[in-house]
From Swiss-Prot:
Lineage: Bacteria, Bacillati, Bacillota, Bacilli, Bacillales
One cellular component term from this protein's GO annotations in UniProt: cytosol
Single biological process term from Gene Ontology: septin ring assembly
Subcellular location: Cytoplasm
Origin species: Oceanobacillus iheyensis (strain DSM 14371 / CIP 107618 / JCM 11309 / KCTC 3954 / HTE831)
UniProt-recorded name of the protein: Cell division protein ZapA
Main location per the UniProt record: cytoplasm
Keywords assigned: Cell cycle, Cell division, Cytoplasm, Septation
Entry similarity comment: Belongs to the ZapA family. Type 2 subfamily.
InterPro entries registered for this protein in UniProt: Bac_CellDiv_Activator (IPR053712), Cell_div_ZapA-like (IPR007838), Cell_div_ZapA-like_sf (IPR036192), Cell_div_ZapA_firmicutes (IPR023688)
Subunit structure: Homodimer. Interacts with FtsZ.
Purpose of the protein: Activator of cell division through the inhibition of FtsZ GTPase activity, therefore promoting FtsZ assembly into bundles of protofilaments necessary for the formation of the division Z ring. It is recruited early at mid-cell but it is not essential for cell division.
Coiled coil regions, renumbered to chain: none
NCBIfam families on file: PRK14126.1
Length: 86
């Protein structure tokens, strides 16, 4: 996809505006931004003393943890399906 074909939107995450460019739909990119904002606010509620940088890192760590769990679950499901097909 060429640079001209990419979607460009402005989103707000943790009370800051960001310009995002991507190949996904505007709706998808807005959903991603909304979920990041939600996760940052959830973590902030538990750890109000964190600065924005630390909060962003904890959000990334939590998100990657969730991603890896889902990836492992997906691999397990694929393995179960393959066994049933054999």
């Amino acid at each position: 996809m060429s640079q001209e074909d990419k979607q460009r939107i402005t989103v707000e995450i943790y009370n800051r505006k960001y310009h995002i460019v991507g190949e996904e739909s505007e709706r998808h990119m807005q959903l991603v931004a909304d979920l990041v904002d939600q996760k940052m606010n959830e973590i902030h509620e538990v750890n109000k003393q964190l600065d924005t940088s630390s909060l962003a890192v904890l959000t990334a760590v939590n998100t990657m943890n969730d991603y890896l769990k889902l990836k492992e679950d997906y691999a397990t499901l694929l393995g179960s399906i393959k066994k049933k097909e054999d």
